Amino acid sequence: MLKYTIFFILAYLPVNADETKMLAMIDYITRNSKYEYKDQTLPTVAIKTTEQMCKDLFLDEVPDPCHIAGYFEHEANRIFIADKPLESMNDEGFYDSVLIHELVHFLQYINGEYEKVSCRRELERDAFNLQDDYIDDFNLSEKLHNDPLFAMMASMCDMFDDWGAGGG
């Protein structure tokens, strides 16, 4: 029982995300996008299993398969990153690649983009593009690139989209 309790505690502890790294990534994003940063409180970063993130995000029914590498929880100003890369991703650079993507969402939120989009999925377009640019510019593994078809589909609103504007 103690082993499981310790795992539970460790699984939800904030990671000591290097503030310098986060600020450097934010600088990269602001130089390569319309988003601005004016010393707002940085989000905390925590590690979770993909399974737990899927349960958190899909309260009713978790899709099978469920492939989530991370997400930004704007209400609590928190970023969650998977404890290990998805099958299609490379170990090396995984954390940075997900962190830059979620920091784009952080900047979208503080810049009011959540209120401007037709649905939350529209927010993914910039996040995927900036993430892929970062991967290229910092010579991270090409295996970290987003699949173009997936990125396009994940960025499109449809008539069944119940996320609405307001971000996530």
Locate the predicted segments by residue.
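Soluble non-cytosolic domains of exported or imported proteins
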Residues: E19-T20, M89-V98, V117-R125
